[in-house]
Amino acid sequence: MNKSFADFFNDQVAFQKEVNEKFGYNAKVENIPEDNVEVAKYHMLALMEETGELVKSDKRWKNYRNTHYDKSNKLEELSDCFITLFNVAMYSGISAEELELALTKKMDENIKRIREA
């Protein structure tokens, strides 16, 4: 599998277009990506839910009752988090190219910070 970042993002854009056509949202969606506060808010709330499911998949961080670890479920929940973040970006009017550029810039800044510390 040699999908690029933009391929994953654009696949999710296509999927969201299908979701919108079949089910819709409580707010009108004209074009994706688009800046749509209501739909972005929906996906931010969904991200909170997905993050909770991710935490449940690996309880080793806890002080007690900390033996539960389900790697396959953790991978699934991490994937859900990434997909939902793509949705937040696309309903914030952010394209795949903009997001990839911002990620690259931020990662470069983090590397520079740690190397200069």
Residue ranges and their predicted role:
Residues 1-117:
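Flexible "arm" and connector segments at domain edges
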